[in-house]
Amino acid sequence: MTTLADLRINYSRASLDEADAAPDPFAQFDRWFKEALAAKLPEPNTMTLATVGADGRPSARIVLIKGVDERGFVFFTNYESRKGHDLAVHPQAALLFYWIELERQVRIEGRIEKTSAEESDRYFASRPLGSRIGAWASEQSAVIDSRATLEAREKAVSERYGDNPPRPPHWGGYRLVPDSIEFWQGRPSRLHDRLLYTRDAAASPGWTISRLSP
């Protein structure tokens, strides 16, 4: 059996100090995301989305972030998927960005709301044709009997809508409105830097910053 105890990296690329951190977590996220882009990391927009179902079971999966502004973090999916059902009963979620090459993580927690129909329509129209057809063909998270069934549905949707499939009513966006955002920078000897931004209406610019023990 593979031995895992000796698999370790001593992080030493950078530090994260309160004096250097932006007072607003969205500005800090933008700074780190731009650095991930500049480092040419593969798909720096990938994140883990964690949800909880009606039975209390947690579930996590990788999704793509498609928008960030002062309102929150936006992603799109099938509302009838497992995550969609989870978010319908528990509209709270957590996101995790992990940029191992930069020895960084960003952890985000908050409430979930659906984006407007206009936002969902606009993003759906920007997707490649195959992805728009796939949104109709796939009953995401449902059991199917074979790959052939999925491909038959894809063909039927393509024949029905041609080059202009509309957005399915079961497909659209969610926005996570954060109440906390943690920035983690790996440091030597596991004494990592962790800065936690917590929403605070009484603070300026609406967030307090705390250092967490690693």
UniProtKB/Swiss-Prot annotation:
GO molecular function (one): FMN binding
UniProt keyword annotations, A-Z: Flavoprotein, FMN, Oxidoreductase, Pyridoxine biosynthesis
Cofactor annotation remark: Binds 1 FMN per subunit.
Catalytic activity: pyridoxamine 5'-phosphate + O2 + H2O = pyridoxal 5'-phosphate + H2O2 + NH4(+); pyridoxine 5'-phosphate + O2 = pyridoxal 5'-phosphate + H2O2
EC assignment: 1.4.3.5
Co-factor(s): FMN
Pathway terms, separated by semicolons: Cofactor metabolism; pyridoxal 5'-phosphate salvage; pyridoxal 5'-phosphate from pyridoxamine 5'-phosphate: step 1/1; Cofactor metabolism; pyridoxal 5'-phosphate salvage; pyridoxal 5'-phosphate from pyridoxine 5'-phosphate: step 1/1
A single BP term in Gene Ontology: pyridoxine biosynthetic process
SUPFAM superfamilies assigned to the protein according to its UniProt record, in alphabetical order: FMN-binding split barrel
Binding site for substrate: R8, I9, N10, Y11, K66, Y123, R127, S131, R190, L191, H192
Enzyme class: oxidoreductase
Disulphides: none
InterPro entries: Pyridox_Oxase, Pyridox_Oxase_CS, Pyridox_Oxase_N, Pyridoxamine_oxidase_dimer_C, Split_barrel_FMN-bd
Positions bound to FMN: 61-66, 76-77, 82-83, 105, 140-141, 184, 194
Oligomeric and partner information: Homodimer.
Family the entry assigns: Belongs to the pyridoxamine 5'-phosphate oxidase family.
HAMAP family (alphabetical): PdxH (MF_01629)
Described purpose of this protein according to its UniProt entry: Catalyzes the oxidation of either pyridoxine 5'-phosphate (PNP) or pyridoxamine 5'-phosphate (PMP) into pyridoxal 5'-phosphate (PLP).
Protein name as it appears in the record: Pyridoxine/pyridoxamine 5'-phosphate oxidase
Organism from which the protein derives: Burkholderia cenocepacia (strain ATCC BAA-245 / DSM 16553 / LMG 16656 / NCTC 13227 / J2315 / CF5610) (Burkholderia cepacia (strain J2315))
Gene: pdxH
